[in-house]
UniProtKB/Swiss-Prot annotation:
GO terms for cellular component: cytoplasm. The gene is argS. HAMAP family: Arg_tRNA_synth (MF_00123). This is Arginine--tRNA ligase. Belongs to the class-I aminoacyl-tRNA synthetase family. Keywords: Aminoacyl-tRNA synthetase, ATP-binding, Cytoplasm, Ligase, Nucleotide-binding, Protein biosynthesis. It is found in: Cytoplasm. It is an enzyme of class 6 (ligase). Its EC number is 6.1.1.19.
Amino acid sequence: MDYKNKIAQLIKQHVDLDIDAIEKLIEIPPKSEMGDYAFPCFQLSKVMRKAPNMIAETLKDAINKDGFERIENLGPYLNFFVDKGVFAENTINKILKDGDSYGESNIGEGKTVCVEYSSPNIAKPFHVGHLFTTAIGNSLYKMFKKEGYDVVGLNHLGDWGTQFGKLISAYNRWVDEEALEKAPIDELLRIYVKFHDEAEKDPSLEDEGRMYFKKLETGDAEAQALWKRFRDLSLKEFERVYDILGVKFDSLAGEAFYNDKMDVVVNELKDKGLLVESNGAQVVMLDDYNMPPCIVLKGDGASIYATRDLAAAMYRKKTYDFYKSIYVVGSPQALHFKQVFKVLELAGHEWANDCVHVGFGLVKFADRKLSTRKGEVVLLDDLIRESVEKTLEVINEKNPELENKEEVAKKIGVGAIIFTYLKNSREKDIVFDWKEILSFEGETGPYVQYSYARANSIISRAENISSEVDYSKLSSKEEFELVKVLANFNNQIKLATDKLEPSILTRYVIDVAKSFNKFYNAHSVLNLDDEVLKATRLSLVKSSLQVIKNGLELLGIDVVEKM
């Protein structure tokens, strides 16, 4: 049962305010002794022409109390104490009935959300920074899907630019074909780094790189064939990484896809009198909005990122008619997106207000900077490998006889990394600390996965369980607190999508695991003479198991059945 909606319906019978407005005002009190839900009466003062305290007292006497243990007024607040047995029955029955679909809603029915995320550069390896956008975007994709939206996952590949001219030059000079077939990204990175090292000694190499890119732009068959090969080899490697992470996309249209779509954008901006010349470049002036000019064409007539993003935004609106278009790109790009969205708005596209930049912080790891050019990168492959190896060491120490321990180590190791990226507000930087990340205690991925495995173990050991349950028996503080947390799943998903902040759901999953462990540490489940209580508590364990599973799924993390 949706208690917020039920309370809103009851209050609506006595006040002139619409249901949605009432529901938004309903709060969950900080302390359980203050009730399970609270309604502040301040906003009703003008409508009812009474003091909030008096309104709370009047409503307390007037409202139907069915389904509630009691309703109290405390100052300007109306506090609702739900009937614990009814609340537990409604919550647990819904979770067990819905199963994997628990948490689904139709909030987004008929609306499309575009989410752009990951967007690695062709011919360059995945480093630890790439996982930030990938993890956030994948989680947002899944959460919006859960709310009934049509979601389009976009991987805006970095597959165009002057660097490809340099790469063609490097390929012609230094490539090792055998190495390229065996480990394409490694070999492409090696020759790319070598190009820059050699160009520092011989600057004419830069001219050669520009010449090859010009050939690529003008459709030279040999240059195009090499570019396509670099792209195909890179995509094959990217797919391997995405398979490990469990990430999928609906579109791989990268920067090159928009090459033939930019003239329309430039002409529209010209026709609307927005383009002006500045130092030889074509720009849109944004002085009135406290922003530097948005460069659309460079002095030599070449396009830049902004041109492509303008073309991409227009293409996506035309193709998907999105309700919201989300760009999961690092916070340093905030100004760039403000400029792009403002230019779209000035061009008369009101839907520019539906475009949102979702920024995120930096990944700090042993004080190393992530510079692809110099090859000094902390590779994602290395991070995953180390995480899985360290997890396997823990398993070999604590449970060496565990079945499929390599597969379990992979799920825990990968899950631990993803969880770390999503645990705190996305704007915060991440500092890796293996001891914390892989701990089975505290606010970590392994702790939540362990809680799931613990619940699964209880259920697997249960035998000859009564079919009769009595939810009024779940009367302890630990039991009721757990039920309340489980009932809050939908609200947390909505809060996370509203704020575009997966950490809200991550914190929620931690709360479920903590509440479950508090309950289990305080109360026996299987070792009971009361068969009805045993069956009822088992239903609570099954519900906890289901919600942890569904929550981790939305974060892009697998559960582990045994540990």
